[in-house]
């Protein structure tokens, strides 16, 4: 496995600074994440999790922290071994100010990892900062989370990481087809009504088929304004989807309906699915009423 075709990210930093939140953000960005991994095991993990096993993910993210004995030295050795394997991991270092970390620990009431060595919280925070200084100095990306909410942090990680790794499509799109006579899906964010298109139900040869069948799809898209509607819908979505991404949204449900949810909505939704996949979005489709229509 080479870095060029399978990105590897190592996320580390100060305890309480938000490493777990960052891992969750990267997981939402379609990375496979492993938290609490000893630094010494990073090369083995990269070897085990090959491209075929993670074919549906953007890359591999390994979360590590100071709880491991000799963490800094073990991380240095693992980075050297990974580079020898042709893998150049990007290191993301998460930090926050001492005042913010103190406040977070007071809120969560969890002990700092170094308090087990007999230190008080303030001393533990300072010692951790000193011990991890070499890692911070060589990190590809340093993120100070002191002033960020979870939603702010999501936007920052997506924006900053995109500048290093390239464009990341964070938005997951679910296309749902339905029949209006059965009701509009309650989870829909956008709803489009296709009942203005010619209905294959009234064509005897097409009635028993569904929008998954080529004759129906051809009829729906080529008769009336099917292709025109699809083109205008794509133009609209190509404008709208990046706006949702910029706001940190990671899920959007597009509902496409016709009378019974069997012919017109299915044909157009399948064409929309193919088009959006070409734009590298994570897209799924669900035909809720196709067998009822």
Curated annotation (Swiss-Prot):
Write down the superkingdom of origin.
Bacteria
What Gene3D superfamilies does this protein's entry cite? P-loop containing nucleotide triphosphate hydrolases (3.40.50.300)
Q: Which Pfam families match?
A: PapZ_C, RapZ-like_N
Where is GTP annotated to bind?
A: 65-68
| UniProt keyword annotations, A-Z | ATP-binding, GTP-binding, Nucleotide-binding
Detail which positions bind ATP: 13-20
Using the chain's own numbering, where are the disulfide bonds? none
A GO molecular-function annotation: ATP binding
User: Which InterPro entries does UniProt cross-reference here?
Assistant: P-loop_NTPase, RapZ-like, RapZ-like_N, RapZ_C
Function of this protein?
A: Displays ATPase and GTPase activities.
Family designation:
Belongs to the RapZ-like family.
Instruction: State the protein's name.
Output: Nucleotide-binding protein DvMF_0424
């Amino acid at each position: 496995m080479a870095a060029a075709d399978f990105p590897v990210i190592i996320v580390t930093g100060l305890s309480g600074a938000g490493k777990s939140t960052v891992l969750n953000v990267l997981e939402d960005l379609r990375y496979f994440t492993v938290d609490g991994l000893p630094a010494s095991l990073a090369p083995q993990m990269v070897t085990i999790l090959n491209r075929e096993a993670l074919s549906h993910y953007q890359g591999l993210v390994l979360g590590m922290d100071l709880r491991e004995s000799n963490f800094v030295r073990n991380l240095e050795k693992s980075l050297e071994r990974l580079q020898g394997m042709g893998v150049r991991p990007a290191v993301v270092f998460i930090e926050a100010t001492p005042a913010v970390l103190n406040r977070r620990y007071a809120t969560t009431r969890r002990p700092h990892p170094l308090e087990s060595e007999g230190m008080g919280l303030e001393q533990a925070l300072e010692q951790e900062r000193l011990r991890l200084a070499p890692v911070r100095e060589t990190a590809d990306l340093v993120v100070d989370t002191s002033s960020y909410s979870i939603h702010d942090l999501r936007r920052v990680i997506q924006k900053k990481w995109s500048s290093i790794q390239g464009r990341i499509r964070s938005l997951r799109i679910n296309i749902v087809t339905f029949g209006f006579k059965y009701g509009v899906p309650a989870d829909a964010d956008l709803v489009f009504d296709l009942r203005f298109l010619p209905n294959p139900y009234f064509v005897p040869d097409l009635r028993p088929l569904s929008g998954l069948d080529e004759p129906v799809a051809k009829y729906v898209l080529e008769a009336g304004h099917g292709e025109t509607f699809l083109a205008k819908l794509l133009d609209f979505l190509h404008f709208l989807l990046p706006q949702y991404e910029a706001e940190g949204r990671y899920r959007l449900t597009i509902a496409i309906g016709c009378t019974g949810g069997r012919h017109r909505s299915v044909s157009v939704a399948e064409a929309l699915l193919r088009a959006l996949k070409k734009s590298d979005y994570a897209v799924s489709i669900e035909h809720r009423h196709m067998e009822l229509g």
